[in-house]
């Protein structure tokens, strides 16, 4: 969920390939159907109500799904400084912009796979985690150019960054080390990473936020929850100013 300057709430509807917008002033909802890269993905998104009805009314246990058709899966959403609404399509390997007034959609292919929960920094640049590509990307909406950095977790390419957030006051990018029980900080000025190991094993972090002191907050979100060490999910707070910087 992201709020724009008018107080409207923008959100992704992953299964049916929509971005939704809710205006609390009048209670109105609107849904923007996003383009799909293939005919099969477009059909599967539109036919979702039929598939759900089919699964509720017929016993499909034991049926083979074959190779199947992946859905585009709109995922991350954020509001740009100019008011534009940007989103990612996880399985379509692209990002896009929605004009908040005309609702016209512009699509941009990414040079990496599986863009997920993206965020803008204070300079109007869009930061994107490459979930299945193990990298961090920065996109300039003005030049339409991408820059990428490999996340320094061994073995290289094994990290699956689920989400990131930008501490705009300090101009730092924080990333969920979802596959390595870490949080990572990236400094765009030096193009360097700092890796902070978490105190619990088999964590799964899906979101980050900050408090006024610059401390980082996240939570464990395993499914099922008992997979985590100690079988008890936790809310975590990391204070980067109170810890020695890891070598």
Name the predicted role of every residue range:
Residues 1-6, 38-82, 111-123, 154-170, ...:
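Beta-rich, blade/repeat-based domains predominating
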Residues 9-15, 70, 85-91, 126-132, ...:
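Conserved beta-strand positions in repeat-built beta-propeller and related beta-rich domains
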Residues 15, 73, 91, 114, ...:
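Beta-rich catalytic cores
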Residues 18-21, 94-96, 135-138, 182-184, ...:
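A short loop-to-beta-strand structural motif that recurs across blades of beta-propeller domains
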Residues 23-27, 99-103, 140-144, 187-191, ...:
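Short loop/turn segments that connect beta-strands within beta-propeller blades
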Residues 30-37, 41-44, 106-110, 147-152, ...:
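Beta-propeller fold detector
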Residues 205-247:
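Blade-level signature of beta-propeller repeat domains, shared across WD40, Kelch, NHL, RCC1
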């Amino acid at each position: 969920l992201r709020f724009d300057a008018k107080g409207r709430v923008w959100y992704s509807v992953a299964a049916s390939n929509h971005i939704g917008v809710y205006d609390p002033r009048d209670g109105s909802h609107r849904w923007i159907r996003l383009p799909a890269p293939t005919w099969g993905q477009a059909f599967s998104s539109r036919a979702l109500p039929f598939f759900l009805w089919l699964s509720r009314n017929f016993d499909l246990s034991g049926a083979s799904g074959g190779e199947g058709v992946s859905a585009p899966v709109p995922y991350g959403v954020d509001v740009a400084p100019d008011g534009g609404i940007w989103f990612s399509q996880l399985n379509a390997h692209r990002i896009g912009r929605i004009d908040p007034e005309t609702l016209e959609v512009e699509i941009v292919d990414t040079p990496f796979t599986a863009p997920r929960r993206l965020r803008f920094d204070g300079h109007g640049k869009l930061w994107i985690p490459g979930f299945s590509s193990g990298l961090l990307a920065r996109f300039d909406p003005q030049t339409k150019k991408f820059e990428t950095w490999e996340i320094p977790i061994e073995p290289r390419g094994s990290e699956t960054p689920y989400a990131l957030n930008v501490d705009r006051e300090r101009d730092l990018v924080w990333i969920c080390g979802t596959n390595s029980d870490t949080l990572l900080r990236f400094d765009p000025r030096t193009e360097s990473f700092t890796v902070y190991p978490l105190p619990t094993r088999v964590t799964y972090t899906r979101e980050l936020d900050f408090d006024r002191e610059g401390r980082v907050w996240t939570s464990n979100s395993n499914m099922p929850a008992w997979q985590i060490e100690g079988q008890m999910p936790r809310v975590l707070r990391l204070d980067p100013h109170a810890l020695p910087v890891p070598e």
